[in-house]
């Protein structure tokens, strides 16, 4: 209600959608390597896309205050974006306890006319775009520790 009163109804719609979806992947966040959205704002403005930017923070398990910014396009079929954290909380050379080393591929569906915008926002070859809706699949690179062979896991 507060977002709607502040004229941010489209952001509220995104949150409402997130609340209503079933468990699993349903959206996509693109992370840049900067602390601002200068490049991304120019791309969205050039393509006639409105957006909302907000600051965010949280305390991590090491009791550090992590800060970053979020950009929410009003168009719900575009991914939202985040800047890098002010402190890098990501462990080096980390392999998840389930054996996942990294994300190998994400298939994300959207409208045909939005695909060029997303390609301009994200040049990472991990992201595969198609005409459709939301995240279709995620492929992980997984290490099997017993024989150290690499396996792909699909979800």
What kind of feature is each model-predicted range?
Residues 1-155:
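Glyoxalase I/VOC metalloenzyme domain signal
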């Amino acid at each position: 209600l507060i977002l709607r009163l502040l004229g941010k109804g489209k952001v509220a719609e995104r949150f409402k959608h997130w609340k209503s979806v079933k468990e699993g992947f349903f959206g996509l966040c693109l992370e840049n390597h900067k602390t601002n959205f200068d490049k991304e704002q120019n791309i969205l403005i050039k393509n006639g896309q409105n957006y909302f930017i907000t600051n965010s923070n949280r305390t991590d398990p090491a009791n550090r205050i992590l800060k970053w910014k979020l950009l929410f396009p009003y168009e719900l079929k575009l991914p939202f974006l985040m800047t890098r954290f002010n402190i890098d909380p990501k462990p080096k050379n980390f392999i998840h306890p389930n054996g996942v080393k990294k994300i190998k591929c994400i298939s994300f569906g959207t409208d045909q006319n939005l695909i060029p915008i997303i390609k301009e926002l994200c040049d990472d070859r991990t992201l595969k775009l198609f005409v459709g809706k939301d995240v279709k699949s995620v492929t992980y690179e997984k290490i099997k520790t017993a024989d150290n062979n690499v396996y792909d896991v699909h979800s």
